[in-house]
Amino acid sequence: TSPNINGFWVMLENDEQIEFPIKPLIDHARPTFRQIMSRFSDLAEAYIEKRNFERAYMPRYGLQRNLTDMSLRRYAFDFYEMTSKAPARA
């Protein structure tokens, strides 16, 4: 995952909205956040495919790395877990 994570997790408690920084969660996660997210690799692929039914979509991770081959867009996220279904180029 990106070392530049600087967002917030927003929680509603009673009627008060509370923000917590995400960076400490990422820095101290055991197992690592990448290991946790790799469990959702199939779900991320399915989401990307769903978005592509609506219109052409390349995830931000692919755009930031100048990935121009749209056939590889379903593998364009940083916690992708290689499987036997994936092409060698992925």
Curated annotation (Swiss-Prot):
The keyword Membrane is assigned to this record: no
Keywords attached to this entry: Capsid protein, Virion
Lineage, top ranks: Viruses, Riboviria, Orthornavirae, Pisuviricota, Stelpaviricetes
Keyword Phosphoprotein tagged: no
Top-rank lineage group of the source organism: Viruses
UniProt protein name: Genome polyprotein
Post-translational modification: Genome polyprotein of potyviruses undergoes post-translational proteolytic processing by the main proteinase NIa-pro resulting in the production of at least ten individual proteins. The P1 proteinase and the HC-pro cleave only their respective C-termini autocatalytically. 6K1 is essential for proper proteolytic separation of P3 from CI.
Family statement: Belongs to the potyviridae genome polyprotein family.
GO CC terms in record: viral capsid
Species this protein is from: Gloriosa stripe mosaic virus
Cited InterPro entries: Poty_coat
